[in-house]
Amino acid sequence: MTNYEEIKQGLADYEAKVAKANAKFPERKEFKEKHVYTPLDVEGFDYCSKSGFPGQYPFTRGVQPTMYRGRLWTMRAYAGFATAEETNARYKYLLEAGQTGLSVAMDLPTQIGLDSDAELSHGEVGKVGVAIDSLADMEKLFEGIPLDKVSTSMTINGPAAVLLAMYVAVAEQQGVKPEQLKGTIQNDILKEYIARGTYIFPPRPSMRLITDTFEYCSKSIPKWNTISVGAYHIREAGASCVQEIAFAFANAMAYICLLYTSDAADD
């Protein structure tokens, strides 16, 4: 059994011994961290409700009871280039090689909602990802790939709702119901305004489009991950490692706050 009185005395002795050494290091006022933590810091801690067991709510120890041994993480290489037909061939090769999911890279015109024949698209079509202009392109992209067997991640933000609608339409053509689909859309528009710049609409309507996507997926595509909040892009745009985390969490909180004021809050 833990002897809290003994720990208190031991902690006091420790702090007295290292006080002079610790004084050499400046403390950051915004953080009230301690130099050492003990069971005293979790005295009265409700293990079941705050930590829980692996695979059980609140999932602080993983969503699978036996971690990756129960279910391996999805293996997916970020891929997409040139035309939908060429990328489709690449996807089939990756799946045959053992990949267990798809990660779709879109070209810049697609990311900002431009057709490949638009004047602003000149020189960028198919360069950093696949060009998707229409439902026909999406059909070619996933031709021969059973969407009820493979999960798909699409790194797309501004037109995320449109690309998701196309994906659902292709699945329905395959006879796959929306509720059978599994995957992710990045759908993190706020980091586009502050880091990457591939946005289409002003912030307010863009945020509304995101919460509408949340609501639709909660009712029609329950296995779909409706957002993947990005931090890496913010760091690459010049943020420090601390700012990277801070801004990403601030963005996530903004989505949650807006969600609570929408019709999708209950879901």
Model feature map: region roles:
Residues 99, 121-259:
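Active-site cavity-forming subdomains of large catalytic enzyme subunits
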Residues 260-267:
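Conserved small/polar residues in nucleotide/adenosyl-binding loops
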Residues 1-136, 141-148, 173-174:
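Acidic/polar, glycine-rich intrinsically disordered N-terminal extensions of enzymes
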Residues 15-20, 157, 240, 262:
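Short, structured coil/loop segments at alpha-helix boundaries
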